[in-house]
Amino acid sequence: VWYNTLLRFNFTEEEARAFLTGPGHSAWQWMQNIQSYGGPLPKSVIDKHVILGKKILARQLELGMQPIQQGFSGYVPRELQAKYPQAKISMKRKWCGFDGTAQLDPTDPLFHEMGLAFLEEQDKLFGSYGVYAADPFHESAPPIDTPEYLTGVGQTIHKLFQTFDAGALWVMQAWSMREDIVKAVPKESLLILSLIHISEPTRPEPI
């Protein structure tokens, strides 16, 4: 999905593959913490991942499970800044010794354009099933930490999902959530997963 999306935003095939980590680190990339480490990813591996992804989705549906697909919250290649110098892109600090990643500001017009392209490319490959994961500023700080800004972030991401898929459900992890983002989204459109709540409660009271 990322490979096809980046080709739509002036990346060459080599640049798009160079953004992707090696298979052993892809989980961290989907958590927005790293890019490129262990890459570039061969096109043959990308193609095999598509085949595997389709098999996983088919099995989930066969078992009556609800797939949760990747959404878009602004994580982008660092190299996007050079290609779109007018866009509001912030560079994050190093994470566990890895070079920091880049964040496209949700208030920038390019955010909606790129997010919609990402969801479209995902739909072409796998279809869409109405539930999308997105964790804005996961394990990092927003460029502007005010209630007004974070409210706008929540509204923008919600609008993106609803534009692509009316009635979409946004799924967010509890450990990196921010209250103003949460409150900006209608309750029926947001599901918060508290993945480690039993051992490490993240919030004692409802918001």
Task: Please give the residue ranges for each predicted region.
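Positively charged, low-complexity/disordered segments
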Residues: 200-202, 207
